[in-house]
Amino acid sequence: MAKVPIAFLKFVIVLILFIAMSGMIEACIGNGGRCNENVGPPYCCSGFCLRQPNQGYGVCRNR
């Protein structure tokens, strides 16, 4: 069995983590989109969902 260099294994691990994180980043709601902080993913890209007390949904905004 051939030996695999450690540097190559590190590269593969970083590549897998990068691909996984890029999928999570794309799965967010942009500013101005409808959101619901009680439901779960997808979340606002900004991390903030502004919901008025009389509405069932919120709007993604910057803090």
From Swiss-Prot:
It comes from Mirabilis jalapa (Garden four-o'clock). Homodimer. Seed specific. The gene is AMP2. GO terms for cellular component: extracellular region. Residues 1-27 form the signal peptide. Disulfide bonds join C28-C45, C35-C49, C44-C60. InterPro entries: Antimicrobial_C6_CS, Gurmarin/antifun_pep, Gurmarin/antimicrobial_peptd. Belongs to the AMP family. Its main location: secreted. This is Antimicrobial peptide 2.
